[in-house]
Amino acid sequence: MSSSIREEVHRHLGTVALMQPALHQQTHAPAPTEITHTLFRAYTRVPHDVGGEADVPIEYHEKEEEIWELNTFATCECLAWRGVWTAEERRRKQNCDVGQTVYLGMPYYGRWLLTAARILVDKQFVTLTELHNKIVEMRERVASGQGLGEYLPPKAK
């Protein structure tokens, strides 16, 4: 395998890794008699269901929404309006299918973006290669100081 193909494969694998939930390896599926109450709860509990969990109060801070958050919301609403997904699909992929690590580790609208990308690839509106190439292009534009229009102005010289 040539080095350019190997590099492209590694880039694709990196992109896929960003889009998949954290995988927890289990060597075998336990028999029904081996499932303890704790294991049953872990299997059936989804990350956004925090009722009854021991926790501390969170100090609430009002914050101004950022441009990328507003644009993410508008884009996702347009995808729904165009029939790409239903609200139930979005909620399922956004809240249940991402895994606890991603759910608790990403900002709210970050999960919306991840969900939109996953659904567009899953339903073959875009290929993973097209998505990866666009991400690389945007990173290069930001790194070169060109900015991303109103979303991220160019760096002042």
UniProtKB/Swiss-Prot annotation:
The keyword Ribosomal protein does not apply. Transmembrane segments: none annotated. The lineage of its organism: Bacteria, Pseudomonadati, Pseudomonadota, Betaproteobacteria, Nitrosomonadales. One of its GO terms (molecular function) is thiocyanate hydrolase activity. Coiled coil: none annotated. Signal peptide: none annotated. Heterododecamer consisting of 4 alpha, 4 beta, and 4 gamma subunits. The keyword Hydrolase applies. SUPFAM superfamilies: Electron transport accessory proteins. Pathway: Organosulfur degradation; thiocyanate degradation. Its EC number is 3.5.5.8. This is Thiocyanate hydrolase subunit beta. It comes from Thiobacillus thioparus. Keywords: Hydrolase.
